[in-house]
Regions:
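Flexible coil/turn and secondary-structure edge motifs
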Residues: 1-208
Length: 208
């Protein structure tokens, strides 16, 4: 992965992002649901979501490809059609899919770039939401439409909605990479500013 000064991705303040007008209902009891998001380098996206209260687990991996298996070396060639993704396990009694999407679009990546994030270029770095059911698809479609109508970005959102077929967990050395390697140049330049942005604007939504 080639580092860049892309950092916090968007220069738009998260304060300019509306809350989703349509969201999944808050669960009455604790539970566990999954969301799979692709927003460039999974190290960076994982680092952001690990901070949020209600997020139970974040696993880096690969989704969206036609090949029967996935590994980092092969996915990086762009030949398998997989994207780097994070699988987020969350408690719907504490945080909603809509909140996860608000963070996805305002902090985790730039959804106006399809097959790149900063200097990371290729279909494996595409912006995508892999929906597990029609409700996840509906929540995502409506929030994208809401952001486009509000002209938050000034250019179209190009995030793809793809049905979730399979999730392949990435190699162990990729998991929790940003926390374990805070001084790595790419992490310092790209992941750390995103985490700082999250803390600045979503302080009341963070783990204590």
């Amino acid at each position: 992965m080639v580092g860049s000064l892309f950092g916090g991705a968007l220069k738009i303040s998260p304060r300019d992002f509306p809350d989703p007008a349509y969201d999944e209902p808050k669960a009455a009891a604790p539970g566990r649901r999954l969301a799979v998001l692709a927003g460039g380098c999974f190290w960076c996206v994982e680092a952001v979501y690990r901070e949020l209260d209600g997020v139970l687990e974040v696993v880096s991996g690969y989704s969206g490809g036609s090949a029967a298996d996935a590994d980092y070396k092969t996915v990086c060639t762009g030949s398998t059609e997989h994207a780097e993704v994070v699988q987020i396990a969350y408690d719907p009694a504490r945080i909603s899919l809509g909140k996860l999407l608000k963070v996805f679009f305002s902090v985790a990546h730039d959804p106006t770039q399809l097959n790149r994030q900063g200097n990371d270029v290729g279909t494996q770095y595409r912006s995508a939401v892999f929906y597990a059911d029609e409700e996840q698809k509906r929540v995502t479609e409506r929030y994208i439409a809401q952001l486009d109508t509000a002209k938050v970005f000034g250019r179209p959102i190009v995030t793809r909605l793809e049905p979730l077929q399979q999730f392949f967990e990435a190699e162990g050395y990729h998991q929790n990479y940003a926390e374990l390697h805070p001084d790595q140049p790419y992490i310092a330049a790209v992941a750390a500013p995103k985490v700082e942005k999250l803390r600045a604007y979503f302080g009341d939504s963070l783990k204590r």
